[in-house]
Structures are given as structure tokens and as C-alpha cells.
Design a protein with these regions (language model features):
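A nucleotide- and high-energy phosphate-metabolite-utilizing enzyme signature
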Residues: 1-294
Length: 294
């Protein structure tokens, strides 16, 4: 199985990819479970194996971060990579072993698993929620629904904090038009596994039918949201105990700036924003320094 992270490259990680997630070792454990466990207990056994891999991966990240305490960007990317690896592996196991296709039915034709929100940005703290979109056709088959159910039970049994939705492309667009929170979460989408063509169609239609038509409205909404957030935090920049996430000049302000630029520029990467003149390279470098500090 090839992991399909669109953003996270091995040179962005704080520790070795192989040490963090040993797929060969996991496959061996899964094969042993298949041979020794009753089918009714197999899903639980898979969850236990992946839970151990998650614990070991987190310990490795913690150990490396203690050695490199200022490498915050690499650390949050590594937590995201670990979750990518676990989710992609779980999907592969579910759709080939627990819910193997019958006749010519191919699961990849009907489902794509997408990271959204903070997870979609590949920015995860140790206890961040894992926000997932199970993208399906308008009427998913019973088998696809069972795959999603098995996936969720495995992830829940691993004690991951899962936020999820199961939607078609049109449902995502319609909900994004009426709910700013959903719209922003969809702005930060990233392919994990499943049908890449379905994901690419989703990406194109979001940009054409949701983001492109509502840039001015989105900017106004975000600026109003920022003003209300500052007021709730007291409206002061200098405080004895600042809220580094929600306060004035905090992490959420930096994220809002990035969201607005990404939305207006119709850009997927910071390079596209720089090429279009929304940031200079120096401004973006300063942005990263501030972001990493927070």
C-alpha cells in the first residue's frame, strides 16, 4: 500500500518515516491475526495492532521533540503523517480483508477519504481531533457504508478523537454555501486514500462552484469573525496571560490571514500565493517564524 499524503514529505518529519510507521511489521501482525483470530474478532484485533503502532509512533515523536524543542513545524507535520499512515493502512485492511469486493465491484470507484480542517492543513498537536470526510457517490452502496462503519469502529477503538461526515460532492458544496465553518473546513482539504479521481473532481468543483463565487463574502465574514473573537478575549494585544490561539495576534489570526489569502488567490500552496503577488518570499518566511513560535 502506498501512502497518499499530498503535503507531508519525509524531509518535513522530525523522525525517520520507517521508525515512525513500520508497514512491513504491521502487515506481518495483521497476517498473523487473520490466521489465528475468528472473523468476528478480527476487527478488534486490527484496532489493537494499530493502537499499539499509534502509541509507539507518538512516543518516538515525543522523544525527538525533546531533543529538538524548537522544531514545532516538523513536529505537527509528523503527528499528521502518523495519522495519515494509520488511516490509510486501516482503509486498506478494511476494504481488502474485512469487506473484500464481490465480483467486479471495486471500492476505489466509490469512496475517497479526505482530511479536512486542521488535519487537512497537516497541523496536528498531540491531542488534536482527526477530522475526516468520507466522500461518496450520492447513494453509497451497502458495502461502502459498511466500510465506513468498520473504519470508524477501528479508529474509535484506537481512542482517536474522530470528527467525520459522509457526503457527496454536491452535498459538500450546498452545505458550504450556507455554513461558514464547513466552508473553511473544506478549504483545508487533503487527499488521504481511496479514489483519487473522485477527489480530483471534488477539488475542481469546490473551486469552481463554491470558492470562486463567494470570495468577497468570505473575506467579510472572516474579518467580522476576527473582530468578535478579539472582543471576547478582551481586545488587548498585550496581556499577562494571553490566549495564544484565540487572542489578538494569536494563532487563529495567522490562520485567518492564510485562509483569506488562499480563498481569494484560489491557491493550494504558499508558492502559488507568492507567485500571484499576495506575499513576498520574505513576508511568508516571517509568517512561518511567527507561526512556528506560536
Amino acid at each position: 500500500m502506498k501512502l497518499q499524503s499530498e503535503i507531508i514529505q519525509s524531509d518535513k518529519l522530525i523522525c525517520s518515516e520507517k521508525v515512525l510507521f513500520n508497514k512491513i511489521e504491521l502487515n506481518a501482525k495483521i497476517n498473523t491475526a487473520i490466521k489465528t483470530m475468528a472473523k468476528d474478532n478480527l476487527r478488534s484485533s486490527i484496532a489493537t495492532i494499530l493502537s499499539e503502532a499509534n502509541v509507539n509512533g507518538r512516543l518516538e515523536i515525543q522523544k525527538q521533540f525533546e531533543k529538538l524543542p524548537f522544531e514545532s513545524a516538523r513536529t505537527i507535520a509528523t503527528y499528521s503523517f502518523l495519522k495519515d499512515s494509520l488511516i490509510s493502512f486501516a482503509f486498506d485492511v478494511v476494504q481488502t480483508i474485512l469487506q473484500s469486493p464481490k465480483s467486479n465491484e471495486t471500492v476505489l470507484d466509490y469512496i475517497s477519504i479526505i482530511a479536512v480542517g486542521g488535519y487537512g492543513r497537516a497541523e496536528m498537536a498531540p491531542h488534536s481531533d482527526v477530522d475526516l470526510l468520507f466522500l461518496t457517490r450520492p447513494k453509497p452502496s451497502n458495502r461502502i457504508q459498511k466500510i465506513i462503519e468498520d473504519m470508524l469502529y477501528i479508529l474509535w477503538d484506537m481512542r482517536l478523537k474522530i470528527g467525520y461526515s459522509t457526503r457527496s460532492i454536491n452535498q459538500c458544496i450546498q452545505l458550504g454555501k450556507t455554513d461558514q465553518t464547513i466552508k473553511t473546513a473544506l478549504l483545508e482539504h487533503r487527499y488521504l486514500c481511496g479514489n483519487k479521481n473522485l477527489y480530483d473532481d471534488f477539488d475542481r468543483k469546490l473551486r469552481r462552484n463554491l470558492f470562486k463565487a463567494s470570495a468577497t463574502e468570505y473575506v467579510e465574514e472572516k474579518l467580522e469573525e476576527r473582530a468578535n473573537r478579539h472582543e471576547r478575549q478582551g481586545g488587548q494585544r498585550y496581556m499577562v496571560e494571553p490566549n495564544v490561539k484565540e487572542g489578538k495576534g494569536g494563532l487563529r489570526d495567522l490562520q485567518s490571514l492564510f485562509w483569506i489569502t488562499k480563498y481569494v488567490a484560489h491557491a493550494s500552496t504558499h508558492k502559488e500565493m507568492i507567485d500571484q503577488g499576495y506575499f513576498t518570499q520574505r513576508e511568508y518566511d516571517n509568517f512561518l517564524v511567527a507561526h512556528n513560535f506560536l
